[in-house]
Amino acid sequence: MSFSVNYPNENFEWSGKNLNTIIFKNKNFFSIKFLKIIIGIIKFNFLAKINKQSFIKLKIDDFLKKFNFSKEFKKYYFYPMCSSIWSNPIDKIKNYKTYFLIKFFINHGLVNLLFRPQWKVIKLGSYKYIKKIIDLSDIKFFLNNTVKSIIINKDKIIIKNKNKLMNYDYLIFANHTDEIKKILPNNFKKQKKILSLVDYKTNDACLHTDTSLMPKNKYNWSSWNFISFNDNVSRLTYWMNYLQNLTCKRNYFVSINSNNLINKNKIIKKIKYSHPVFKHNKEYTLKKLEEIQGLNNIYYCGAWCGYGFHEDGVVSAKNVSNYLL
């Protein structure tokens, strides 16, 4: 898993893919700007490993100011990295809790300069494991059945969709918090308040073959490629050939919030995704969530219960299963 940062208007780009791109192929290596980036990375990694209790309540922007991190570190590494991870604009990332980010960086080996964990991908992507679940279970699936609302009738939960009412003993919500709030009854005020601890933001994604959003120097092409025109838009391009080990000759990319910059003749598909916006530490959100788990025989899980990734969704689903066993 490699990462590049590109500021075309400043003619500045770099990639942390390997020592070759960091040192030998990096024309900015001997610049003061790049030196400040490296010093900032070493300093942040050191402080993250200390992981003091006093960091917990600080917003990340306040933390970086408190410890006098350079603007170069923030602009050309840290905020682009976080913005890319959560597909959120930098002004929202600045309000993330320090402890939340530090825990994530530690768990994913991002505080190690060397010997970072080797990321692996599932062949055919998430389709593969969803199919596996379907094939191995005797669960009935109702596709394209939008749930409009639910009704609580004594010890039964009535699910209302477009065509009919269905009665169940238990209900597990495994979707986004904003969707859950729309489905819950109006008098579920406590549940809706707790679910509001995590918001969602819609992002545009585009599958295409346009190389213009990639770093100018091909040595800097990485799995994740952040590009900024000094605005607050979070633009990221995934190099799918490198990420998923595609063997085809043509390069394929998925870009976030960049539709207007992509050559229309090279667009394959446009998609809209929703990504979580975290306002609190994970531990606080989970503690509050415990207050409503099981009320009215309703349970909640999803990637938003962790850091917003597939593995977080799996862990939260396992936790809900333990409630029911």
Please place each PLM-identified region on the residue numbering.
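A residue-level signal for conserved active-site and pocket-lining positions in enzyme catalytic cores
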Residues: 64, 82, 133, 208, ...
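A conserved FAD-binding loop/helix module that cradles the flavin
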Residues: 301-325
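Short, well-ordered alpha-helix to beta-strand connector turns
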Residues: 137, 168-169, 295-296
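Mid-domain catalytic core of redox enzymes
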Residues: 148-277
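A structural signal for the hydrophobic beta-strands that form the central parallel beta-sheet
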Residues: 141-143, 173, 300
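Mobile amphipathic helical/loop "lid" adjacent to a hydrophobic cofactor/ligand pocket
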Residues: 1-103
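Helical element adjacent to the flavin cofactor pocket in flavoenzyme catalytic cores
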Residues: 101-161
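FAD-binding beta-loop-beta segment adjacent to the flavin cofactor pocket
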Residues: 246-247, 261-300, 304-307
